[in-house]
Amino acid sequence: MKPESGQALFHVALASCLCVATVHTGIFEHVSVQVGYEYYAEAPVTSLPAFLAMPFNSLVNMAYVFLGVYWLRSQARAPGGPAERRRARYLKDVFAGMALVYGPVQWLRIGMQTQPTAVLDQWLTLPIFAWPVAWCLCLDRGWKPWLFLAVEGLSLCSYSLALLHPHGFELALGLHIAAAVGQALRIQGRHGNISSGTYLALGVLSCLGFVVLKLCDHELAQWHLFQQLTGHFWSKVCDVLQFHFAFLFLTSLHTC
């Protein structure tokens, strides 16, 4: 493993551990989250252990791990010398590390159905959407480590909105999605090509599917197509796809 890859994974692990420790202090114990099988259209199978009680909604989270491993093993490409390639590898591997962490965290939420795991799942979603913003800023303004720290720090702090209002997380997530799409459109206009534009369009469509399918989980269950593989399951598929297309979009800009 390259030193910058190890550094990227260490930074992701450190930030994740700090989030876990913060959640377990109880500071977010009054945050409104959905806990319980009744919030999912997939019927739990009582004969299975808790971590597989909703088998499809549980196992789909392995896709994040596979995605993270795939991109962690992929080669980073960037114009310029070794320094530029090291920076491109760090950017890519932080994002891959986030995918590696996010899959197990979501599985914990599905399997345990506790308030702390639900909070952790919500909280870690925000810096994942913030990383493409930081990546785009790096492509546009050059390598500025303090900028990464500022973007991710602001993203993590934005979860405090969940303490102020029952829908504070949804507001924070909406702002993150808008910022990520806005930065991607801006960087596409300045540095993109047809290929990167295609990846961006597919990523935005996947993001739309991720949001709509999750919100309509119970409504879609009225249709036979969504009774076994529910809206929540397909929203996770769309989430993995938007992750993948974000990788393709951002890494393609390094070679434009």
Swiss-Prot record:
Keywords for the protein's UniProt record, in alphabetical order: Membrane, Transmembrane, Transmembrane helix
Membrane topology value: Multi-pass membrane protein
Keyword Transmembrane assigned: yes
Subcellular location: Membrane
Keyword Chloroplast on entry: no
Coiled coil segments of this chain: none
Main subcellular localisation: membrane
Superkingdom, taxonomy of origin: Eukaryota
GO cellular component, one term: membrane
Pfam families in alphabetical order: TMEM187
Range of residues in the leader sequence: none
TM region(s), chain numbering: 8-28, 51-71, 94-112, 119-139, 146-168, 193-213, 233-253
Name of the protein in question: Transmembrane protein 187
Species assigned in the record: Bos taurus (Bovine)
Native organism taxonomy: Eukaryota, Metazoa, Chordata, Craniata, Vertebrata
Primary gene name: TMEM187
